[in-house]
Amino acid sequence: MTVYAIIGGTGLTQLEGLNIRQSLPMNTPYGAPSGEIQIGDYAGREVMFLARHGHPHRLPPHQVNYRANIWALKQAGAEAILAVNAVGGIHPAMGTGHFCVPHDLVDYTSGRQHTFFADDLEEVTHIDFSYPYSEALRVRLVAALAAEGCAFSDRGVYACTQGPRLETVAEIIRLERDGCDIVGMTGMPEAALARELELEYACLALVVNPAAGKSTAVITMAEIEQALRDGMGKVKATLARVLSAS
């Protein structure tokens, strides 16, 4: 049986309903992860949980130790990762409260520690990253969203920006021209690092605001926080359905 890990993003720093049996403080060659790895029972099976931004939420996207997080999950025994991400909507279909299970991504970040293949190498390794997300996991997420009656898109291109600021209107125009449908700040290098360690990885993205220029209103944290409160119940129900069906 596949060992699943859930990485919780903004709005999901705790997994309510997880019957925690163990909290592992992990040490890695890359420093400390965002927090302890919680291991317990959820939706009838064992699962790991890690809060990407820490609990409470304290780490901005550009300061998350992605290498330590992925390494720690691998060392704890994870085989597949379901990553939850809060995003802005670029494509007209991606309104607030809409879900997207992206099939591809574009990385616009800079300066992040983005690979395990950096130090004391005996040989250079080039991973195939043509399709960054596990299709098998994507299919399970899509089926779960449909069963939950959620509004969702079964495909989409995730633009990962540096953060922590939101994007300018001109930047969103550029991302849209590049073919991106949603925009977030934490999808990379997380997905690539998972691939380097041969972990299955997929993203469940919740749209919490229209991207810059996609609404006449100014984007506010109050708006984002309300969208997170409204959507987290569906996020947890979707994750539970994936796990119980796997």
Swiss-Prot record:
Keyword line: Glycosyltransferase, Purine salvage, Transferase
Glycosyltransferase keyword on record: yes
One of the GO biological process terms: purine ribonucleoside salvage
Q: Where is this site: Important for substrate specificity?
A: 167, 221
Q: Which reaction does it catalyse?
A: S-methyl-5'-thioinosine + phosphate = 5-(methylsulfanyl)-alpha-D-ribose 1-phosphate + hypoxanthine
Transmembrane ranges, per UniProt, are none
Residues binding phosphate, per UniProt: 10, 52-53, 186
Broadest EC class? transferase
Its annotated pathway reads:
Purine metabolism; purine nucleoside salvage
Q: What SUPFAM superfamilies does its record include? A: Purine and uridine phosphorylases
The record, for PROSITE patterns, names: PNP_MTAP_2
Q: What is its EC number?
A: 2.4.2.44
Q: Name one GO molecular function term.
A: S-methyl-5-thioadenosine phosphorylase activity
* Function statement: Catalyzes the reversible phosphorylation of S-methyl-5'-thioinosine (MTI) to hypoxanthine and 5-methylthioribose-1-phosphate. Involved in the breakdown of S-methyl-5'-thioadenosine (MTA), a major by-product of polyamine biosynthesis. Catabolism of (MTA) occurs via deamination to MTI and phosphorolysis to hypoxanthine.
Q: What protein family is recorded?
A: Belongs to the PNP/MTAP phosphorylase family. MTAP subfamily.
What is the annotated quaternary arrangement, including any partners?
Answer: Homotrimer.
The molecule here is called: Probable S-methyl-5'-thioinosine phosphorylase
The species this protein belongs to is: Pseudomonas syringae pv. tomato (strain ATCC BAA-871 / DC3000)
| Species classification | Bacteria, Pseudomonadati, Pseudomonadota, Gammaproteobacteria, Pseudomonadales
